[in-house]
């Protein structure tokens, strides 16, 4: 048991880490291009932050959080998402006092106790952006463009942008009355979870994945038809900005998202994975979140996308993730004195900015060359007794097997060759 990771977790091995470096690098490059700066928040937060921010009627808070009491008796939760912690940091450090908007991005592990499946784990990793302090639909469109740009930078095809408006507290309260009236005669046909949602948060019933519930919702009244004037105007503005940026979108009135803080804009990006359509990004506006978390009234909009899901999408579409270059040099030594001299040379090369390694297991020359191939070294440097007597080493180009001799006392020529000059 001790040799197996907990269910729902996954080790990222050295042979796979380059995929993560690539994906994270693209995330960061695109986010910075849009003027977003990185923020890092703790892995755990006070439980109340998520109860107040995410919503105590959500599946995340009711069923999926990793919550425990610390030694001081305080309720602590491993963060299940990144937006509420970003809002907490925005409040704590009084970032609202700066010139707005505040635009931030993060890459973070998040934790949810749910059934593990392809691309989804109990510990997974999320890239997210948050823009606080601007209520204009242009910021919504910018955030959506950022998300689409990430997947376009990956080369992912068949992207579908779906948008909706989930209204504001004012028009949602009126809509909830209409929705409850519609559902009241069908309540017995809904799953237990949706029956519990009926009074507390009926709009989440629309998002239920149960076939029996969906069968009762074929003609359900939609939030889109009950928006107040302000929310309707905001949605119309969003569409204009998306069209101005050349983004094609589909209006999907059934997108409600799984977190209670969303207001007005909600969106998802869909792509095809293993022959099935799957959501690879989701987000929206949350104009009440900062206030609900104890800060001043501040609008916000953002999204989250899973790194594991992104890698899976690339692999499913046959997109090759660039592999990193190998070592500049591997030093092959024969004998104790040669090992010392090789270590001295390797240290000098590393300090000069070159990547390299040497044998540490007293292996045969053949085994050392085999290892040099494994680490994809561009060159090998061979040092044995004969070479030491002459004060030289042999430099071998691993691509064409050409060998030349170099002076050990003066490695200027060696550095020029390794630099490609």
Curated annotation (Swiss-Prot):
Keywords noted in UniProt: Aminoacyl-tRNA synthetase, ATP-binding, Cytoplasm, Ligase, Nucleotide-binding, Protein biosynthesis
Record keyword Lyase present: no
This protein's GO CC annotations: cytoplasm
EC number: 6.1.1.21
GO biological process, one term: histidyl-tRNA aminoacylation
Source organism superkingdom: Bacteria
Gene Ontology terms for molecular function: ATP binding; catalytic activity, acting on a protein; histidine-tRNA ligase activity; transferase activity
Pfam families the record matches: HGTP_anticodon (PF03129), tRNA-synt_His (PF13393)
Compartment(s) where it occurs, according to its Swiss-Prot or TrEMBL record: Cytoplasm
Reactions the enzyme catalyzes: tRNA(His) + L-histidine + ATP = L-histidyl-tRNA(His) + AMP + diphosphate + H(+)
Alphabetical list of SUPFAM superfamilies matching this protein: Class II aaRS ABD-related, Class II aaRS and biotin synthetases
Quaternary data: Homodimer.
Family according to the record: Belongs to the class-II aminoacyl-tRNA synthetase family.
Protein name: Histidine--tRNA ligase
Organism this protein belongs to: Alkaliphilus oremlandii (strain OhILAs)
Gene field: hisS
């Amino acid at each position: 048991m001790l040799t197996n990771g907990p269910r729902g977790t996954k080790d990222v091995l050295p042979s796979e880490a380059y995929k993560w470096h690539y994906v994270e690098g693209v995330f960061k490059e695109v986010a910075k291009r849009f003027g977003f700066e990185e923020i890092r928040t703790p892995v755990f937060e006070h439980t109340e932050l998520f109860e107040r921010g995410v919503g105590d009627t959500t599946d995340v808070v009711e069923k999926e959080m990793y919550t425990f009491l610390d030694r001081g008796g305080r309720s602590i939760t491993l963060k299940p998402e990144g937006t509420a912690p970003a809002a907490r940091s925005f409040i704590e450090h009084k970032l609202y006092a700066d010139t707005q908007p505040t635009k931030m991005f993060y890459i973070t592990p998040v934790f949810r106790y749910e059934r593990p499946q392809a691309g989804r784990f109990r510990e997974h990793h999320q890239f997210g952006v948050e823009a606080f302090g601007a209520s204009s639909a242009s910021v919504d469109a910018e955030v959506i463009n950022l998300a689409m740009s990430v997947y376009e930078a990956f080369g992912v095809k068949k992207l579908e942008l779906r948008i909706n408006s989930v209204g504001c507290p004012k028009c949602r309260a009126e809509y909830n009355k209409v929705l409850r009236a519609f559902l009241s005669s069908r309540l017995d046909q809904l799953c237990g979870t949706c029956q519990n949602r009926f009074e507390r948060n009926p709009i989440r019933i629309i998002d239920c994945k149960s076939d029996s519930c969906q069968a009762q919702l074929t003609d359900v009244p939609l939030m889109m038809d009950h928006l107040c004037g302000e929310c309707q105007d905001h949605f119309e503005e969003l569409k204009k900005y998306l069209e101005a940026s050349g983004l094609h979108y589909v209006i999907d009135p059934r997108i409600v998202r799984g977190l209670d803080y969303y207001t007005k804009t909600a969106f998802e990006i869909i792509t095809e994975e293993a022959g099935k359509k799957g959501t690879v990004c989701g987000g929206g506006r949350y104009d009440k979140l900062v206030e609900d978390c104890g800060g001043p009234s501040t609008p916000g909009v953002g999204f989250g996308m899973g790194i594991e899901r992104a890698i899976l999408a690339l692999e499913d579409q046959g997109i090759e993730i660039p592999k990193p270059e190998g070592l500049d040099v591997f030093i092959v030594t024969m004998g104790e004195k040669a090992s010392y001299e090789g270590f001295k040379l390797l240290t000098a090369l590393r300090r000069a900015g070159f990547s390299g390694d040497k044998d540490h297991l007293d292996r045969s020359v053949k085994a050392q060359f085999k290892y040099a191939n494994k680490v994809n070294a561009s060159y090998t440097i061979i040092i044995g007794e004969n070479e030491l007597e002459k004060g030289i080493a042999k430099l071998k180009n691993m691509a064409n097997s050409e060998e030349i001799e170099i002076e050990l006392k003066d490695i200027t020529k060696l550095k020029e060759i390794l630099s490609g000059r």
